[in-house]
Amino acid sequence: MSSLSEYALRMSRLSARLFSEVARPTDSKSMKVVKLFSEQPLAKRKETYDWYPNHNTYFALMGILRSVGLYRDEHQDFKDEQLRLKKLRGKVKPRKGEGKRAAKKK
């Protein structure tokens, strides 16, 4: 006489699949693989994605502080100065519809 009926075996396999357990008995080597796949991926672990600060937030905050005058970003100051000098020399890109080809048509 068998210990479990066909129905009981099917139900136990189904419940194992539903609750992320191993459906059939497996050896220790296979269980090691199952354990590895059941762990959360490295990129989804909190200690991984909380390692670096949220750059978008910090960038926006530093921009606000810079505009108020509480933070000095020398690299951005340099880029702004270069753009200002470029405008003075007339070397800025023309706006749409004001380029060489548009000037020819007029």
Curated annotation (Swiss-Prot):
- A GO cellular component entry from the record: mitochondrion
In which broad location class does this protein mainly occur, judging by the first location in its UniProt entry?
A: mitochondrion
Compartments, as annotated in UniProt: Mitochondrion
User: Which residue intervals are annotated with compositional bias (Basic and acidic residues) in the record?
Assistant: 95-106
Q: Where is this region: Disordered?
A: 85-106
Check the record and name the InterPro entries matching this protein. Ribosomal_mS33
Among its keywords, does the record have Ribonucleoprotein? Answer: yes
Q: Which residue ranges have biased composition labelled Basic residues?
A: 85-94
Its keywords, alphabetically, are: Acetylation, Mitochondrion, Ribonucleoprotein, Ribosomal protein
For the modification N-acetylserine, which residues carry it?
Answer: S2
Q: Which family, according to the similarity comment? A: Belongs to the mitochondrion-specific ribosomal protein mS33 family.
The UniProt subunit note reads as follows: Component of the mitochondrial ribosome small subunit (28S) which comprises a 12S rRNA and about 30 distinct proteins.
In Swiss-Prot or TrEMBL terms, this protein is called Small ribosomal subunit protein mS33
